[in-house]
């Protein structure tokens, strides 16, 4: 199916193939992240990003046709880190351990750079990223389902449905904490695990 014009304009013009060009793209993305953190969305223009990255605007436009395409690339960079952390969490030996590690990965993603995470959440809602959002949800859901299939997991009538519910609980609580500007990762982890534990206890006894 052909890409819609709205989706097509979010694609990079080209991908870096050499170390030098990869360094340029990373410098541009990190410059955008720093501006978002320190000055906010309004200040994050392509001119400001290029200046902060130490490259020409022309060099920036070689890779990104507009600011939205650059923002999507930044979102993808942060998402790749989250998914790598979640996949590592899915290697634990116990159901509880895997779920706890996945909660920690989600909280750490939000708290590592909280201002950036909050603004990226805002941009994710604004931009048409349906395919990306589904890909992320599917990956995390698969990891949660795997955790619920281990021998020590609670007895559940529908593990896949329970994994969707857990995904909603974790995502909702972590995003809400980010919107409130919470910074205490340990406290948030405890609250999320209480909610997850309460759900699993209730579902297994239903």
What kind of region is each of these model predictions?
Residues 71-78, 120, 136:
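Alpha-helical DNA-contacting segments of helix-turn-helix folds
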Residues 80-83, 97-104, 108-112, 127-153, ...:
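Amphipathic alpha-helical packing segments from all-alpha helical-bundle domains
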Residues 21-32, 49, 74-85:
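Generic hydrophobic, amphipathic alpha-helix propensity
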């Amino acid at each position: 199916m052909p890409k819609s014009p709205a989706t097509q304009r979010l694609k990079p013009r080209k991908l870096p193939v050499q170390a030098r060009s990869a360094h340029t793209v990373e410098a541009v993305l990190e410059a955008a992240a720093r501006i978002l953190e320190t000055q906010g969305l309004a200040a994050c223009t392509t001119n400001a990003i290029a200046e902060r990255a130490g490259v020409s605007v022309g060099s920036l436009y070689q890779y990104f046709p507009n600011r939205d395409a650059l923002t999507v690339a930044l979102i993808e960079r942060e998402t790749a880190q989250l998914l790598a952390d979640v996949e590592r969490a899915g290697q634990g030996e116990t159901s509880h351990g895997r779920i706890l590690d996945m909660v920690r990965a989600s909280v750490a993603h939000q708290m590592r750079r909280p201002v950036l995470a909050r603004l990226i959440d805002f941009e994710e809602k604004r931009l048409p990223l349906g395919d990306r959002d589904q890909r992320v949800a599917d990956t995390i859901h698969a990891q949660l389902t795997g955790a619920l299939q281990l021998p020590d997991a609670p007895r559940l009538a529908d593990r896949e449905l329970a994994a969707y519910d857990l995904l909603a609980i974790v995502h909702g609580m972590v995003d809400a904490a980010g919107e409130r500007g919470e910074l205490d990762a340990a406290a948030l982890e405890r609250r999320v695990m209480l909610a997850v534990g309460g759900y699993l206890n209730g579902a297994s006894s239903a």
